[in-house]
Amino acid sequence: MMKMLKKEEMGGYGEVESWWRRWLWSTNHKDIGTLYLYSGVWGGLFGASLSLMIRMQLGHPGAVFLKSDWFYNVVVTTHALMMIFFAVMPILIEAFGNWLIPLLVGGKDMIYPRMNNLSYWLSPNALYLLMLSFSTDKGVGAGWTIYPPLSVYPYHSGPSMDVLIVSLHLAGLSSLVGAINFASTNKNMPVLEMKGERAELYVLSISVTAVLLIISIPVLGGGITMILFDRNFNTTFFDPAGGGDPVLFQHLFWFFGHPEVYILILPAFGVMSKVIMHCSGKEAVFGLIGMVYAMIGIGGLGCMVWAHHMFTVGLNVDTRGYFSTATMVIAVPTGVKVFSWLATMAGSKFKMKPAAYWSTGFLFLFTVGGLTGVLLSSASMDVSLHDTYYVVAHFHYVLSMGAVFGVFCGLNHWLPNFVGVCFNKKWSKAHFMAMFFGVNTTFFPQHFLGLSGMPRRYMDYADIYAHWHWVSSYGSAVSFGSLMYFKFLLWEALVSQRGVVFSGGLCGEMDWAGTRDLYPGSKHVYSQLPFVWTNPYNTCITYIYKKSRNQ
């Protein structure tokens, strides 16, 4: 007897949808988001494995684990690129964005579904080329910044650097195509009441991120193309002997590189706003309009401060003064966001779900990273601390603890919506405790190393630094163990099939309200636009849905 197929199991034209068609040629936002999630988790685990190799080497003075200083720098380079382009960005922007943006704007899918599919399949090809550069010739040991002259002949004479540059081109193209899709979706698809200042904060964070990507990715592409031409076509864009200037590449790279920091952290801001609002039981975050303009201000200022990475290259006093002041000004909108989150928690019966643990941990750790950033924004201070472990500690507090805690917070909050099962709550809280202890033990001692003068990118060091390096390596082992524990938690949730009884979401949460009667939801939640009602005071929005569960 023929099996009756549900509509979700049918293709777009009524035929049975095969496994290959669903996952290789998918134009469904949820399937593509799931693919990004799988890819990002794999990239994150591989990048974390490389970081453990780095810390095993630095646990004791001398070449105790990695016998070659060149290979040490190859591992550092691959770790950075893997975590940025193939772990945090695929999960925070692409996976969560693909899953949630259509739900939050009231749309059926992304505005360009086929472009969405193209955006994903460029990413595995870029990942393959990155792995190929890691194993080709001697690998790329120039750091993720690939500064010339280290990235050109004769210092990188093999093909590995060329392969890496092509990988970055593909990764950048993937991000650019996805950003155009997100920006177009967020501009054109929201129902009327969800546009402008009334947009969901996560939607706004993805919109600002998409604009930053559209501005900065072409500049990176131009810079690395110039390196490719210097290496292969005898140009001298960055060679002083031919009239070039290596500092030009630093300007091009950091015009991309600093917005990239906000590209990584802004989606985490959106996740925190959603989770804190949910766990506080409130219909809107405190100071909603201030939060909107703070996020826009952070994105705008982020494009104007790139040269604070270059205080030691010989900038004149006026230029250093401008970039130092502009960098400090970013602390103002960032402070607005942090205190608005705290005010949202105030006066509420805060539900300490696992996601709430990650959100409160994020607030503490991101604040610490921001305070060390204020010190580094001073041009005179940065001259002493530039390229020391103080800088490593600063950006890992913002990224390894900010963006990554945003990833875990989002997974704990939205996994029931994505796959219909829940993590074990007690075990998830234990995972947070282990991760929180591990990352702090790893990176807080590195402030002391930097203040003592320990430089970055060296595999060996004086014995005086051995104690804090040992403590940092111990914390790294704890962090890696907590990641393995998370793999177990994910497996346990999928095997036990611990279903969702009810979402706990308020009526104003479109990500939950659209699928409130079934988890996970169908491939397309809305067959028609939802009806949206705003209260007279414009402080929050309540959503009323017609029954529209069909395709």
Curated annotation (Swiss-Prot):
Subcellular location: Mitochondrion inner membrane
Organism: Mytilus edulis (Blue mussel)
GO function terms (MF aspect): cytochrome-c oxidase activity; heme binding; metal ion binding
Role this protein plays: Component of the cytochrome c oxidase, the last enzyme in the mitochondrial electron transport chain which drives oxidative phosphorylation. The respiratory chain contains 3 multisubunit complexes succinate dehydrogenase (complex II, CII), ubiquinol-cytochrome c oxidoreductase (cytochrome b-c1 complex, complex III, CIII) and cytochrome c oxidase (complex IV, CIV), that cooperate to transfer electrons derived from NADH and succinate to molecular oxygen, creating an electrochemical gradient over the inner membrane that drives transmembrane transport and the ATP synthase.
Annotated pathway: Energy metabolism; oxidative phosphorylation
Sequence positions that bind Cu cation: H258, H308, H309
EC code: 7.1.1.9
UniProt keyword annotation of Repeat present: no
Sorted UniProt keywords: Calcium, Copper, Electron transport, Heme, Iron, Magnesium, Membrane, Metal-binding, Mitochondrion, Mitochondrion inner membrane, Respiratory chain, Translocase, Transmembrane, Transmembrane helix, Transport
Crosslink feature (1'-histidyl-3'-tyrosine (His-Tyr)) location: H258-Y262
Quaternary data: Component of the cytochrome c oxidase (complex IV, CIV), a multisubunit enzyme composed of a catalytic core of 3 subunits and several supernumerary subunits. The complex exists as a monomer or a dimer and forms supercomplexes (SCs) in the inner mitochondrial membrane with ubiquinol-cytochrome c oxidoreductase (cytochrome b-c1 complex, complex III, CIII).
Annotated family: Belongs to the heme-copper respiratory oxidase family.
Protein encoded by which gene: COI
Main location: mitochondrion
Record PANTHER family: CYTOCHROME C OXIDASE SUBUNIT 1
EC primary class: translocase
Transmembrane segments: 34-54, 81-101, 126-146, 163-183, 209-229, 252-272, 285-305, 326-346, 356-376, 391-411, 432-452, 475-495
Protein name: Cytochrome c oxidase subunit 1
Residues binding O2, per UniProt: Y262
Chain positions recorded as Mg(2+) binding sites: H386, D387
Listed GO biological process terms: electron transport coupled proton transport; mitochondrial electron transport, cytochrome c to oxygen
Cofactor(s) this protein requires: heme; Cu cation
Keyword Translocase: yes
UniProt-annotated binding residues for heme a3: H394
GO CC aspect terms: mitochondrial inner membrane; respiratory chain complex IV
Record's cofactor remark: Binds 2 heme A groups non-covalently per subunit.
